[in-house]
Amino acid sequence: MRSCAPRSSIRLFQGNSLPWGGLMPKGDEVMEVRKLKTVIAGCGKIFPMHAVPVSRDPHAVLTAVCDVKPERAGAAAERFGCRAYTDFEVMLEQEKPDVVHICTPHYLHAPLACLAMERGCHVLTEKPMAIALADARRMLDTAAATGRTLGVIFQNRYNAGSQLIRRCLDNGDLGEVRAARVLLTWDRSPEYYSQSDWKGTWDKEGGGVIIDQAIHTLDLMRWFIGRPVTGVQASLANRTHPDIPVEDTAEGRVEFEGGAYGAFYVMNHYCT
């Protein structure tokens, strides 16, 4: 385990609200509020997208990172001035964090999230929430049983255009949404899948273009329509990636409560 001294300090706030929603005494009374101890599991490509904002957040302190590759964990810890671990459970025991960010391969999201919540931590995990419906339900059940907050990254909801559409829908400016259509054309080379042993697999990634690329756009469709999904019909195909078993093309129809529906065609072998 690599050890570096983490930065930690006390922040003072005035007023009656805390940045994460807690309440303070009204008036000018000042009380001490400690920073949220934060750790990150997984130091791969998406890691900096979590570590950088956490390190800049005045209400949080990054105390540790964890990765199964010691050299990667060590490099991340040195960059952000925190401790490095290769064992997730040991990190939880030693650090006793308030918040855990999960940036691991997909199949690890559910077990790590549940373990962290059972240890009293709030969790923010990268998408997808899980690779199986039963695992996603277990995560929700664990959050409810422990009283911890569970968050899943769907950053496209916060794009300026997405926020504008959501406001227009909430205000009734666009009327009732009865149908939506998704067309997604990405390009993923064979090298994208060969760079790791979990990409392009059913048991570790959980699928192909739907769970990895189209998940964001399909999430926006459901968010804009704003109703529960009642049915899905879809067909999957692999047209240009013979070395992987998962789909690179999918099309289908999503039915929503109240009669609205969405159609989608997605691929990650777009020719440019």
Region spans (language model):
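N-terminal Rossmann-like dinucleotide-binding module
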Residues: P25-F80
